[in-house]
């Protein structure tokens, strides 16, 4: 018995370790809300699954061939009580589960601003093949595959795509949302404490999809201001011409920063007045072209 308890404890420890850095290790209010909805839904479903499994084993044991005390009813066909239990419990469970998820989804509406005494930071996000462009309009800078935010400050993300549909997702901050060409999605997130995280593309988008990841750093306010100053002091300018180079298909792009950015660039990308990227090609249509694995500097 002690060995069994030890095995269970080790298994739980390994599972919890595997959750580190993911949606079950939230860093902000939206991430915690997502984790709560997931855990509550799991508990509600287990309340049905576990008794059902236990009853299946009990039925097999109770009505085994060697048990002569078990009641044998060869002509039994209907029981109102059993029908009531079989139908009412699943219906009530679905209603309860739906209510929990609906309330959680309403509270976690991605368009709803987060309440805070600090002013909200705006970051414009563009999904490219196969990299992420982050524009800080108020600071006049941009980065590729690197998102830096001040800890404890709400962030409003305006998200679009210069290629195919994609999904922007930072697991520890919560709520994945579509990046769509010709449209702008809104998402409000917050990192409560300084930390190093990662973000991903959560929808397949072609050859370089598996490498379409980005670094996420939440830092103290002073460090964020110092980082902004460093970026503004060096690096290239991101305008429509340099964006034309950036939008080309490339994978495993290193972290890149731009000291200045065209203030109308994001609007041009979202409205598609600036030409979008080529998008992933169908099999057999590469025409000899290769996907670049280099960066843009």
Regions inferred by a protein language model and the residue ranges of each:
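Membrane-water interface of transmembrane alpha-helices
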Residues: 51-66
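Non-transmembrane, membrane-proximal soluble domains of secreted or membrane proteins
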Residues: 20-37, 63-297
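N-terminal secretory/membrane targeting signals
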Residues: 1-21
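Generic alpha-helical transmembrane segments of integral inner-membrane proteins
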Residues: 11, 15, 47-54, 88, ...
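Hydrophobic transmembrane signal anchors and adjacent membrane-proximal interface regions, especially
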Residues: 8, 16, 43-47, 120-122
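Generic alpha-helix structural propensity
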Residues: 42, 51-55, 80, 100
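Membrane-entry segments of alpha-helical transmembrane domains in multi-pass membrane proteins
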Residues: 1-6, 30-51, 85-88
